[in-house]
Structure formats: C-alpha cells, structure tokens
Amino acid sequence: MNNNFTKYLSTAPVIGVLWMTFTAGFIIELNRFFPDVLYFYL
C-alpha cells in the first residue's frame, strides 16, 4: 500500500495542486505584508 500511495503523490495533478496552493498562499501572504509590491511595476 505504501508504494501505491507514494506513486499517487508523485502524479502530475497532485503535484500541480500542491504547487498552486503553495504559490497562491505565498502571493496572498506577500500581498498582506507588502500590499503595493504586486502593482508597483504596472
């Protein structure tokens, strides 16, 4: 069972969802502490 679970975690949709969740959280926290950084270069 452990082999199937690690194979499931290494699939592209799971890695994509985890990566997008991390990226969204990072941008949200960056925007919370530095609200003008995202719009500075526009």
Curated annotation (Swiss-Prot):
GO terms for cellular component: chloroplast thylakoid membrane; photosystem I. InterPro entries: PSI_PsaJ, PSI_PsaJ_sf. It is found in: Plastid, Chloroplast thylakoid membrane. The chain crosses the membrane at residues 8-28. It is a single-pass membrane protein. GO terms for biological process: photosynthesis. Its main location: plastid. Keywords: Chloroplast, Membrane, Photosynthesis, Photosystem I, Plastid, Thylakoid, Transmembrane, Transmembrane helix. SUPFAM superfamilies: Subunit IX of photosystem I reaction centre, PsaJ. Belongs to the PsaJ family. May help in the organization of the PsaE and PsaF subunits. This is Photosystem I reaction center subunit IX. It comes from Porphyra purpurea (Red seaweed).
